[in-house]
């Protein structure tokens, strides 16, 4: 018996991908032999399995059923087939782009996922169509006239030159003895806006800028003050004004899960149980034993269910309101998966009231099926986050460029397919793609120092759905291992012009081709080390093809295997790539106008 289902093929499932609550979904299964019955098993998380009999349609020669999905949430499904009084399970095939396979093993059936949301998240054109640049403020640029460092912190360590390699200064117990600084500041960022604009950047995302002891500033001392080493509120206003004058935007980092142990909030809580801040924290043994972030005692965790704290962050005179009123354009939320859903909704609500629509959460996994303490987190419902940092995209890009065989490459492509299928379209297009951040090794280091591979990684990031985000210095060829080595100073005057020009070209291509922003997605497998990512809409097809081998290659349509592409689009892509020469360790972007193709038929 052969049974066929493919969640990417409209013959078998309509509509494709994530759906809005209230949508009717049609499932169809083709079976080449007579069977007794076919059943769709559909499960919503935390609810009982539901069985839906499928009816044979003599016209389509398929077993079919249509079901209205009334409420948002996370659903899983598979099919049960009865033949000769034996049961078969039609499950998701591994790394096969939505295809299904039969099994009689009922112990671990691989299900298909169905994401259901209440409403699509808003898409700000400046963001969805743009290019973001992440800056770790202390390590980017010092804009003071003579490079002097202002607002120096007591007992801190200042490096002699920007070329120095950062390291942590710890005591015999492994605790930080001194925090180290290079002296980058807000004026320095403002000074480099022309560089960023030339690169093609349209928005910058800053790691935390509020008052703190450390160089990373995830240990907030005071949410209402700019860190003196970075500058003043006036410096921030000047940066925002300069960005807006250049049609660029600003995203700030909100760290609302924990504060610094030397913050005004925690210090007052430890000094007085009658303090307004005492209830913000969970003391195990007052005052020296308390709940902290992952056991890091310098980062006491805040009780996010505390109404006073929530109001301090999200109230009309709170932290978000204060800074967003200065025309901040969006927020990234640190460790969003540790913030309660009601807190995330309160954050979103406050920002909407301040006319700010962008709330990006730090979530490292596929955010469509994220669980925290066995509780499902409905990030895609439409009422909390509007996107997440796309670390799965980083992982699959690296896997594509390091795969030892074609099976590894197909697996990486399939990982992208899962994101496209699991995420609502607008949510995916709002995700912040990256190939490196302050929490990862530098992409050039990961790829063995090979700048041609780094260029291909940039190309994949720009060609994939989501907003490309460049980690400062990656485009300059900066290297770095794990934290703190990945936080070196920007190498002004020693940049890789090859990578800078690559990024600038990709930014121009993304701006010129709407398919790279909101087009559908498909893949082409040619041979080991040579693959293509396809984006298309009703007007154009854009193909990003890379060759990571050490040979120039004449592309041959007969070698091309396409995935997740309608037959007509697949044929056009083959025509577009056929007989093209792709140089070794290089990539190419090819475009075809759909209207011209239609007229030429």
What positions do the PLM features span?
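Aromatic/acidic polysaccharide-binding cleft in carbohydrate-active enzymes
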Residues: 138, 372-374, 378-387, 429, ...
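Active-site-proximal helices and loops of the catalytic beta/alpha 8
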Residues: 240-249, 258, 263-273, 319, ...
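Conserved, mostly hydrophobic/aromatic
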Residues: 29, 135, 196, 206, ...
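C-terminal beta-strand-rich structural cap/linker in extracellular carbohydrate-active enzymes
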Residues: 31-33, 131, 570-601
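Glycan-association/targeting regions that enable binding to alpha-glucans and other polysaccharides
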Residues: 1-128
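Surface-exposed beta-strand/loop patches in extracellular or lumenal glycoproteins
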Residues: 26-32, 38, 549-563
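Substrate-binding/active-site clefts of carbohydrate-active enzymes
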Residues: 136-203, 209-326, 346-353, 369-370, ...
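Carbohydrate-binding surface patches
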Residues: 14-16, 524-560
